[in-house]
């Protein structure tokens, strides 16, 4: 059984609009890396949001590890905590994920929401700061950070949850060459360690480094009335 299964899902943002995803099916195995490609409007970000439980299809079924994920499933606080501990999501725009707390507090926020012990939270925060060489910025608020530092801080916050699955929306977008190389190496290491990666990216070198299975999405045609 695949870890992630989408069975003929259809999603639209409004009833009168053409669906962004129509009768779409997908399966992803544990430890696999899947790269989503396609033009703007093809549904890459929408698909990532469905996989992370931020959007829900109007038709079809999403199964994660054999359990159906829908609004009712995630309304249960215990199940929602388990799901979001297992599936981490990096937005394309890191500002969506960062508040005005210090970077240390930003990274600690997710583990704290999961109810982890204080000592465990401190260890995870320390390790994630070190992973991205962000220790000198630990007491700074995000508005003091560059765009590349914000992206790394947002990914650090995701990794602090220690998720099995990483859902990443354009993880290298807007980064300089040095930071792109650094994050490519990190994601390659995570992939080698058995993490499941699903990402939207236009970066050919990243796909090659991750040995990703590539899925090209295209926007559905409007239905005839």
Indicate residue ranges for each PLM-predicted region.
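Conserved ABC transporter NBD signature motif
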Residues: 60-72, 83
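The feature captures the beta-strand-to-loop junction immediately N-terminal to the Walker
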Residues: 37-39
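H-loop/switch region of ABC-family ATPase nucleotide-binding domains
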Residues: 201-202
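Conserved ABC ATPase "signature" region
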Residues: 119-137
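Catalytic Walker B motif of ABC-type/P-loop ATPase nucleotide-binding domains
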Residues: 166-170
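Conserved ABC ATPase signature
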Residues: 141-145, 149
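Helix-to-loop junction immediately C-terminal to a conserved catalytic motif
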Residues: 52
């Amino acid at each position: 059984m695949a870890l992630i299964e989408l069975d003929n899902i259809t999603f639209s943002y409004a009833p009168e609009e053409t669906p962004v995803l129509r009768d779409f099916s997908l399966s992803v195995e544990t430890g696999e890396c899947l790269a989503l490609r396609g033009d703007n409007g093809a549904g890459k970000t929408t698909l990532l949001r469905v996989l992370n439980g931020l959007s829900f299809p109007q038709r079809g079924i999403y199964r994660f590890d054999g359990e159906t994920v829908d609004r009712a499933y995630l309304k249960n606080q215990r199940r929602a905590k388990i799901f979001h501990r297992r599936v981490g999501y990096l937005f394309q725009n890191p500002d969506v994920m960062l508040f005005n707390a210090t970077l240390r507090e930003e990274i600690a926020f997710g583990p704290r929401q999961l109810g982890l012990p204080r000592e465990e939270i401190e260890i995870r925060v320390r390790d994630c700061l070190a992973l991205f060489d962000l220790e000198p910025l630990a007491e700074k608020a995000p508005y003091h950070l560059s765009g590349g530092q914000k992206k790394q801080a947002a990914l650090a916050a995701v990794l602090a949850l220690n998720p099995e699955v990483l859902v990443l929306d354009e993880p290298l977008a807007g980064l300089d060459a040095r930071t792109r190389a650094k994050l490519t190496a990190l994601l390659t290491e995570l992939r080698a360690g058995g993490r499941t990666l699903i990402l939207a990216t236009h970066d050919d070198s990243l796909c090659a480094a991750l040995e990703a299975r590539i899925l090209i999405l295209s926007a559905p045609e409007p239905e005839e009335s």
